[in-house]
Amino acid sequence: MSVKDVNKRSGELEGKLKGKLFLGGTKPSKEDVKLFNDLLGAENTSLYLWVKHMTSFTEAERKAWGAPVKVTATTSASAPAKQAPKKAASAPAKQADEDEEIDLFGEATEEETAALEAKKKKDTDAKKAKKEVIAKSSILFDVKPWDDTVDLQALANKLHAVKRDGLLWGDHKLVPVAFGVKKLQQLIVIEDDKVLSDDLEELIMSFEDEVQSMDIVAWNKI
């Protein structure tokens, strides 16, 4: 599979997984296992480790990395013959006379000064670009109405219309309870430093004409 194919497949999967923890919603299934193995292979442990390491860095950190280090392979047959570094011992003696001609206290050229300033600016910009890892949580909660006359779909639309920094609305569904009454089950993702449990409860219960109570079913750190 080419890099182009991987990018295309990744884009399709991003659309399927948007607002979800798994392909089926809140619980993993055999479909998730099959897709995972199709993408990475069932026994590619080194690839798993690489993906895990890569996802531990932010996009800004990855962009700040330099070029890859080139490593030249050395065969066992040629290794013993490479004794050339020992000849470097004569270099200091040869350079002794040349050192006298070098101005150790000479001023840097304009090119050297400009290069140094550019490097300092690049390092400063790289540090500014680094971001701390943002702690997030996925929360699944139930919203129970007063009775069966409450339009839960309309309530879900009202909730999703609420925009708040650090809050992402995911999938929702209507689950039968009893006697024709249903409850709204909603999945969200929050940034822990921006949205607290009290904030969430206050938001849901503010729709007091429709909402009788809310209960958190699952709370998982991402």
From Swiss-Prot:
Record-level GO cellular component terms: cytosol; eukaryotic translation elongation factor 1 complex
Keywords (A to Z) from UniProt: Elongation factor, Protein biosynthesis
Keyword Protein biosynthesis part of the UniProt annotation: yes
PANTHER family: EF-HAND AND COILED-COIL DOMAIN-CONTAINING FAMILY MEMBER, ELONGATION FACTOR 1-BETA, PUTATIVE-RELATED
GO molecular-function terms, A-Z: guanyl-nucleotide exchange factor activity; translation elongation factor activity
InterPro entries recorded: eEF-1beta-like_sf, EF1B_bsu/dsu, EF1B_bsu/dsu_GNE, Transl_elong_EF1B/ribsomal_bS6, Transl_elong_EF1B_B/D_CS
Organism (species): Trypanosoma cruzi
UniProt entry tagged with the keyword Protein biosynthesis: yes
UniProt family annotation: Belongs to the EF-1-beta/EF-1-delta family.
Listed name of the protein: 25 kDa elongation factor 1-beta
Assembly and oligomerization: EF-1 is composed of 4 subunits: alpha, beta, delta, and gamma.
Job description of the protein: EF-1-beta and EF-1-delta stimulate the exchange of GDP bound to EF-1-alpha to GTP.
Region (Disordered): 75-98
Highest taxon above the source species: Eukaryota
Biased composition (Low complexity): 75-94
Pfam family, any one: EF1_GNE
